[in-house]
Amino acid sequence: MKTSKYQQIIDFLKKAIQQGQFETGQKIPSVRQLASQFSCSKDTVQRALLDLTYQHFLYAKPQSGYYVLEQEPNRHEDLPLKLDKDRNQAFEDFRTCINETLIGRENYLFNNFSDQAGLLEVRQSIQGLLKEEGIYTPSDQIVLTAGTQQALNILSQIDFPNKKSQILIEQPTYHRMNQLLDSQQLAYRTIQRNLTGIDLEELEEIFKSGHIKFFYTIPRFHYPLGHSYSTKQKEAILQLADQYDVYLVEDDYLGDLDGSNAPSFHYLDQKDRVIYIKSFSTNLFSALRITSMILPQALLKPVLTYKTILDYDSNLIMQKALSLYIDNGMYLTNKKRLLARKKEEEARLKTLTTQSPLLPHLTLTHDGILLELSQVQSLAALKHSGLPLDFFEAAYITSCPYQLAKIKSADAANVLPKLTPFFERETLV
């Protein structure tokens, strides 16, 4: 298959850096020069250079160009779709906002104690951002926490208006939710989530028991399966929640990657029983521990009371910087960049899977490929092969069924050809 201009530029610059043709701190050829050299558009060059900054080969100087970053042995990996490294464009933009935040506001930010719910201005910024995404709420129903883990911890500990005690979780699910339930010895039940959703009849039986306080769900780009509920499925789940007085905790951690703008549970909710959670660390950078919760009115006081015990408020400097980052359009710019990269990755992965003899066993997700394991000759041999596969052990609160494994997007081209010997020959194409 012919290598794209984008990849040719990346390969050329990587090789030149690794062989010492470009030394640490040296400016590389300009965008215009590279575009001429490779007979491509400036946009293609910019995307390639951006990718190399994510991989820590280059760094950018505003109004100057790109320079070679100091190299460390065995440090580089191909970039996964999830842009969670600190040296990326989102980080550079956010650092600009932090610097702007500190100008003339030192006394305010270092000596002020804000509302326990978070700075009003950042909650108003988030309110506007959510409105753009079809999620409508007044700013006084938004509460900021120091990450999703803190939000889930608070919700698991407080009493809900329905006076129930059990938490329902999907299996598999976010590993930190499993850890929270296990470490706090909280009462819980589970329901199986697969590549098509959940069994609604089973869900009704569980709700009907009368003990479910809330149902924690990841409706869009489920972790780790990548599945998203259809609008019809969401409406059915909400109807059951209304009927049996169950709250829904909607973790929309990758909602920004949904180019279809499918309605959220919160949008569809008519009975004020959805708690909507949006994290800002997943799509910006992992050190940004700010998560927003949209709460029903009945939960505002108990959440804020319990939050006071844990901490008074989240980092004010980071809150103010996030407000600026949203208000000046950088957040939406980063979102567009993520969607563009996701589209590119999906096209690349689709080509890889359609050309693979393993095609019947493969399912594309937003960040990689799922591998169905029922036809593997020896699961033990595959597990000990050294191949970079995620078998989802931590995503199950009890024993892992080993039904699926994930190949990360960045590993797909290398790993797929090495998997064929592990499968029954008659199941290949």
Which role fits each region the language model picked out?
Residues Y276-Q355:
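PLP-dependent aminotransferase class I/II
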Residues Q166, K213, D245-Y247, R273-I275, ...:
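Proline-centered loop/turn at the N-terminus of a beta-strand
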